[in-house]
């Protein structure tokens, strides 16, 4: 049995969409065709309350019904099955990395043309593991070539930025 089960009907465009998304991500999955396999229909009915509630995923035992792609990526990442990489959510003004048990993020605000990174958060269970510094490094590598000014008000982000001369210069530390 696979870690990813997709319940659906191959004739359904949404089911085909999810099949393509999983294949694009290089993920192995089991296709449970509820219209052709009575056992698959019964398993979906037990999982979702009806055999008609497809497409539905079961990802490492967790039910995920008809997700948008970012939500699917998040569920796959939290299950340790896929790494969508660093995500820049401009609307929420955050850089995000999906992981279990909760996402890591760096928040920022705009002050005119200046990006001000105000906070980093990593699940407390990872404190002291170096994960926060690695995540901050990943964010800094993402933004270091941007033309706009970037300031850091978060003490932890400032501490990490002080480790490299190019970041001290970019973030105007030590001036």
Please identify what each model-predicted range represents.
Residues 128-141:
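Conserved acetyl-CoA-binding loop-helix of GNAT-fold acetyltransferases
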Residues 1-27:
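Local sequence-structure signature of Cys/Sec-based thiol-disulfide redox active-site neighborhoods
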């Amino acid at each position: 049995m696979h870690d990813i089960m997709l319940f659906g009907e191959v004739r359904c465009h949404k089911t085909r969409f999810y099949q393509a998304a999983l294949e694009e991500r290089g993920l192995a999955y089991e296709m449970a065709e509820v219209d052709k396999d009575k056992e698959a229909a019964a398993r979906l009915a037990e999982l979702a309350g009806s055999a008609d509630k497809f497409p539905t995923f079961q990802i490492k035992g967790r039910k995920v019904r008809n997700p948008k792609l970012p939500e699917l990526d998040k569920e796959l990442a939290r299950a340790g099955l896929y790494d969508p990489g660093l995500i820049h959510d401009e609307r929420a003004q955050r850089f995000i990395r999906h992981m279990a048990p909760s996402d890591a993020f760096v928040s920022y605000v705009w002050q005119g043309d200046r990006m001000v990174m105000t906070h980093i958060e990593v699940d407390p269970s990872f404190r002291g593991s170096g994960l926060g510094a690695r995540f901050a490094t990943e964010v800094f590598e993402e933004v270091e070539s941007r033309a706009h000014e970037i300031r850091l008000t978060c003490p932890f982000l400032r501490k990490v930025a002080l480790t490299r001369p190019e970041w001290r210069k970019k973030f105007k530390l030590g001036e």
